[in-house]
UniProtKB/Swiss-Prot annotation:
Belongs to the TorD/DmsD family. The lineage of its organism: Bacteria, Pseudomonadati, Pseudomonadota, Gammaproteobacteria, Enterobacterales. Disruption phenotype: Mutants show no swarming ability. Acts as a chaperone that increases YcdX activity, maybe by facilitating the correct insertion of the zinc ions into the catalytic site of YcdX. Involved in the swarming motility process. Keywords: Chaperone. This is Chaperone protein YcdY.
Length: 184
């Protein structure tokens, strides 16, 4: 697993799973103890420090639920809610064609798309590099800026207000890397 994959896996997990999910305990422990920064491949120390200082799990969970859960959520985490004419089925078909195992949850969720990027990067054949470019250019970039802007605007906790720019910068850095790789 390389740095690109780690970024996508960490960010994808934080968006995909509710904060109280037992599978996130080790990740939140790393954040709370300031140890995530030691393994974080981007220069985002200030943002990571802000995350570390804002790990009140009750507040983080309540904010997550208000932001992302239910029909009345403040910021729908699904591509189909942001891109006119987009469907979850087209994302599911794209990922299925590449052999990615998918759960019954919506495939166009921001967390699923970031986890898919990690999975595709871990597969790492020439074809998967092209698949990663497609994932970013068609399924992530067209809406993630608006989505993250709304997360930042509607979040009531410093944690989620910080996750938005942290994610935005990471996605931008990963896209830059993909573009550089495709030019070689």
């Amino acid at each position: 697993m390389n740095e690109f994959s780690i970024l996508c896996r960490v960010l994808g997990s934080l968006y995909y799973r509710q904060p109280q999910d037992p599978l996130l305990v080790p990740l939140f422990t790393l954040i709370r103890e300031g140890k995530l920064a030691a393994n974080w491949p981007l220069e985002q120390d200030e943002l990571l420090t802000r995350l570390q200082k804002s790990c009140d799990m009750t507040q983080v969970s309540a904010d997550y639920n208000a932001l992302f859960i239910g029909d009345e959520c403040a910021v729908p985490p699904y591509r189909s809610a942001w891109v006119e004419g987009a469907t979850e089925a087209e994302v599911r078909a794209f990922l299925s064609e590449r052999g990615m195992p998918l759960a019954d949850t919506p495939a166009d969720h921001i967390g699923t798309l970031l986890l898919a990027a990690s999975w595709l990067e871990d597969q790492s054949t020439e074809d998967e590099s092209e698949a990663l470019e497609t994932l970013f250019s068609e399924y992530l970039l067209p809406w993630c800026g608006a989505f993250l802007g709304k997360v930042e605007a509607h979040a009531t906790t410093p944690f989620w207000r910080t996750m938005a720019p942290l994610t935005r910068d990471a996605i931008s850095a990963m896209w830059d890397e993909l573009e550089e790789d495709s030019e070689e």
